[in-house]
Amino acid sequence: MDKILTVLTRGRLFLTVTLAMICILGDFLLTCATIISSNLRRALIDNGTHGLVGLLSWAVVVNPTLLPLGTLVREPFLWEILLCGVLSSLVDLDHFAAAGTVKLQNALSLKSRPPCHATTLIPVICLFLLLIVRLFKLQRIRRLPLILFVAWFSHHIRDAARRGLWLWPWGSTSPLPYWLYITLIVVIPYLVISLMNVTNYWTGPSVDSKHLPSVTGVQHV
C-alpha cells in the first residue's frame, strides 16, 4: 500500500474530480423543484450524496485504480471504501434518534442539530477509537479510525455549506463559502494520505509487495 500512497496517478486525479462533481451534482439536484417538493426525495438525494462522497473520498486514499480486481476483493481495500460510504450516510440516523421517531417529517424538523453533527466530537471519538485499536492490537481494523474520520468529517463539511460547522459547546460557524466547501472535500483524502505516510502503522504488511503493481511507466500528473 505504500506505493499507492506515494504515487499520484491519473486514476487518483480522476477519482478526485469525480468526488468534486458528485458534490456539485448532489447540491444541484437539491435545488430542483421536483426534489425539494418531497421530503423523502430530498432526504434520499442528500443522504445518497453523503454516502457517495464518503465512498469516493476513501477511494482517493486507497486509489484502487492501481490494484487488480483480485487484490481489491481479497484485501480490505474494497470493503474499506464501501464502509466509508455507509458510515457517511449513517451519520444522519441521529436525526431520528433525537426526534424519538422514525417519521421523516419529525426528523427533519428538529429545533437544533442532533449530537452526531457536533464537529468537536469527531477528533474525540476518532482518537478514542485509535486508542482502543492500538491498545488491543487490532491490526485488521487499524485504519478504521481514519475511515471514520473521513466519513464523518466529509459529512460535516458538506452540511457546513448550508449551516456552518457546529463547534459544540462554543456555537456554530457561518456557512462555508461554496468554493471552500468543495476545496475541503477534495483536500481531506490527501490530508489522510499525508498522515498515513508519516508512519507505516496505518499501512503495515497487509498487502504482499508481489500484489502491488510496479510504478514503472505509471503516468504522473
Model-based region annotation:
Residues M1-V221:
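N-terminal membrane-targeting hydrophobic helices
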